[in-house]
Amino acid sequence: MKNVVLLITDTFRYDNLKDYGERPVRTPALDTFMDDHATSVSRFYTGSFPTIPHRTDLARGVLGWPHYGWQPLVQSGPNHIARILGAQGYATQLICDCPHLFNAGFQSGFDAAFQHRGQEADKHLLHLNHPIPEAMPAEKTRRSPNWRGKTLADQHRWLNRYYETEAEMFSAKTSATAVRWLEENYKAPPFFLWVDLFDPHEPWDPPEYMVDRYDPEYSGEPMIHCNYGHATDYTETELHNLWAHYAAEAELVDRHIGSILQKIDDLALWDDTVVIVTSDHGTSIGEHDRTGKSNINDADDKE
């Protein structure tokens, strides 16, 4: 039986890859994976695309939307890929930084599960002696969910305020944990490894030197979180900086997924391993006068 490595990202646009997009993003690791090892699916129907409904589809093997929405996995039915593979003799491991998986019970059914805490205002440790500063203007970002009058962008940067270097970024930490797991378990096949990166979901806070490569002339406040509304709420330079933060975070994700793919290569696992790289959805960064994952508004043209 072949090993299975499932690599999930969140909010990773398909046109980040290769030369598919009008605004190029550097994704050398995934581009090489597509060329050398992968079958790329370019014509498809999306399933339940929000974070937990999407992963519920993957875990259960059936489409949940519109029969049920965002809910704990146990409420969606009995099937669970980890339990099914475990019954066939697979060792099963979940490694994630996505803050919603453990809340929805996805760790149940795995032999072992590990989460890096603190993504997207996941309040694992409070620092209330230190005030929560404004990460970006409130009128330029998503207003809810709100905590103590602070936006998600504010909460995220406050909780992770000591994280400045690349090694401290979530994609780096989670991928490093996956690399270590492969080194410590590759001699014990078959295994199922589910690695779940929440990046490049907003807030987009990669090292600013990476952002500068996409937007070297910008001198305003960093635009790290979209407003889930009209793109016209931003100036042209702010909107470009918003995209630059997203692009840099997507590049960072590519780099650290690349470290997992490189370790699979180092351990000579390709012939015995099915590797799946996927994402739940993309995001708007100015297209159709929207940023984020926005609803259709009453004032929108329906034709």
Predicted regions and their residues:
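Catalytic domains that recognize anionic headgroups
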Residues: 1-303
